[in-house]
Amino acid sequence: MAKRWIAGLALTAALFGHTARADDAPPTPFIVIDQFGYTPAMAKIAIVRSPETGFDAGWNFTPGALYQVIDTKTGAVVYEGRPAAFRDGAVDPASGDHTWRFDFSVITAPGRYLIRDKLAGYDSYPFDIAPDVYKPVLRAAVRMLYYQRADTVKDARFAGAAWADGLDHMGKGQDGEARLFSKPGDKTTARDLHGGWFDAGDYNKYTAWTANYVIALLGIYAEKPAIWTDDFDIPESGNGVPDLLDETKWGLDWVVRMQNDDGSVLSVMGLSHASPPSAAKGPSFYGPATTAATYGAAGAYAYGAKIYGGFAPFATYAADLKARAIKAWTWAQSHPDVTFYNNDPRDHSEGLAAGQQEPDAHGRAVKALVAAIYLFDLTGDDTYRAYVDAHYTDGDTDAIELLMHYAGLAQATPAIAQAIRTNVTQGIEPVWPKGEADAYLSWVPGYWWGSNLIKANTGNLFADEALYGLGAHPAGAAMARAAGYVHYIHGVNPLGKVYLSNMKALGASNSVNRFYHTWFAPGSTWADVRTSKFGPAPGYLVGGANPTYTWSKGCPQINARCGSAPPSPPAGQPDEKAYTDFSDGWPIDSWEVTEDSEAYQIGYIRLLARFVD
């Protein structure tokens, strides 16, 4: 392929608001920055890039000797410096790019800026520097959970006129009177199981996963309660309770409804699908109680009782949650191996929901450990402490925050608390040198389905090191490393893509235009920011780069919609370029790349909240 070189050219009027023809513009920007911006004290490093492999390899960029920071309001040059080649200009295998770094951390004055290659006249997207630069972004990310609420009217006052919708999934045979999947004709199995959140781009609801989300959100609140105000424009705003807790309660209340009288907890719900959600008229079904769902719920009930118990209006609610947590634990302890595989021939459940919520034995053990941690925190009962002490090694990297929660309790067994701290530190330390070798300042062990969650979780790992005083690195250094993962999601990546949907109004120049979601389906009013009336709702974090993506098994023979080859990108690209905005369903299966998830969203919320004061 013939390469196009951009070096030493006067491009002040080109690209991103320039006058060059659209077909002359490179498909990816050559200077990438956090498109929302930076807090004044943050390290600020723009990545300059020249593609070598991947779909944009036809373009090359040679940076000039001097880079400038431009105040967009005045046009003044406020700083000038030199970009430094990363790894002596070697190609980064994860991105397929040559990269350089331009450090402009000396700029701390609030304002709106851009980075300019002085010789080429080439500009980055604009960005802000401000103490509260991420606050509106965090608000949008949390409001995604409101858009994902099931069984409610999306009032225009809160959703905005573009995403207002009527009551969903509350008609005959739906969530208010859902039936057991294995007995669809038995009206005696009907249960009121309304509430909760659509789990992802599908509308299904999974108990153990929702319990995880509840626990994570409660932990996010507990870490920095002062930042969680009562003004996120959800229906509960202004009630005197932080809106994050109001939103969390929406999910927790559904987990409460899923509990049986004997303490066991139902596992999953399958809902019908249409765009918008209120157009979905098919019946709703649920799966039976399982050990995993019950342990998961026990942990959510217990932590909920602890947090909501701190608010006088929730005293009765907290007491009920405590009783439910103990009852769920008791049932799960006496029923340690009750499983249900939804949408699976093993339990004749094909068609019930989509994702497989039933974990393996290790996954059940982790859920039991989590339940014991929060029950001990709530009750101080030695039964739960003894369980944690005997099983803390069942935890893995996904349970670090939970284990550290136990280690921080005054009544935790000192030797076990120290062992947890040692184990976590030993897990974090090897990541440091790897992180230093990453071209885009956000190393992860690999890229696959849901890579943006891997990014968020790795960033949270460094932030945990700072929070808990682990390892040999100063807290400031650990937080600086964590910030790299925020910046990646906000555009410091080979695509210059903000991996959040429809964020132009909040300052992003290149955010997600379309992604896989039943509501925002192709051809709908909400399909694409660029071509549909409204585009998808703002603030959704998509899955991200996935080099393992492929079309459905059997393509191209199984359906004409396959086309002749899987779309590239994402297929056949370097790891970090294995992404494009697309929303096709079967057989193209865009959900492997662009679908949202409550898990992705909450991991990102946790990370971003750590940079909001």
Feature locations, PLM:
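Carboxylate/His-rich catalytic cores and anion/metal-binding grooves
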Residues: V241-S264
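Sec/Tat signal peptide C-region and signal peptidase I cleavage site
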Residues: H18-A22
